[in-house]
Amino acid sequence: MSSVPQAPPQASQEVQLIFQDIVSTVDNKNMPFIILDKKQAKIYSFQKDGQLLGEAPALLGIAIGDYYYPGTGQKQMSEIKVEERTTPAGRFHALLGYNSHGEEVLWVDFDMAIAIHIVVKGTVKDRRLERLQSPNPKDHRISFGCVNVPAPFYNNTISPYFIGKGGMVYVLPDTKKLTDVFGESLCKTSR
C-alpha cells in the first residue's frame, strides 16, 4: 500500500493547505505541479502523484502584489514600472519553452511574460545569487516578475518532469486570501 503524499513538514501552513486540496481533488489533472510560496520565497516541485521532487529558495518580482498589470508582458523591460514588477498569484498551466535568448524556461504564462527559470546573473548590484541564499524573504524580491531558481533545482525537478503536456503552477498570494485566488472549491481545507 502506497503512502499518502504529504507536503514538506517545514512548509508554511498555506503550502500545507493548498497541497492537501490539490492532491485530494486531483486539481493538478495528473500532471506534475509546483507550489510557489511568495511570502517565504520558497518553491516546491511535486510529481503528479504529489511526491516531493525538491524545494528551493526563489527570487520573485520586486513589487509585493498578486495582480498582473495588463500589457506588462508586451513592454520592454526598461518600460516596466517598479510597482508593475509583481509575480502574479494564481493557478497556471505551465509549459516548457524558450525565452528570447534561446534558454529553456517554464512559461507560467507566456502572454504575461512570467516564467520560472534558472537564476540570471543580473547586474553586480542585483547580487542575485547572494539574495537567493538569504534567509530573509524580503531579500528575494528583485526580478521583473519571473521566478528565478537555482540551476540544480530547475534541471532536476522542473525540466525533466514538465516535458510534453507541462504541469500546474500554484502561486500563493502575498496579500489576498487563498480562497480569493483559488476559489472555494480548491480551498476546502483552507477555510
List the predicted regions and their residue ranges.
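Soluble non-cytosolic domains of exported or imported proteins
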Residues: 9-13, 30-33, 37, 144-148, ...
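Exported/periplasmic cell-wall-interacting domains
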Residues: 85-191
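Residue-level detector of alpha-helix boundaries and kinks
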Residues: 3, 7, 28, 138-142
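N-terminal secretory targeting signals
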Residues: 1-21, 184-191
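Gly/Pro-biased beta-strand-loop elements
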Residues: 14-32, 36-127
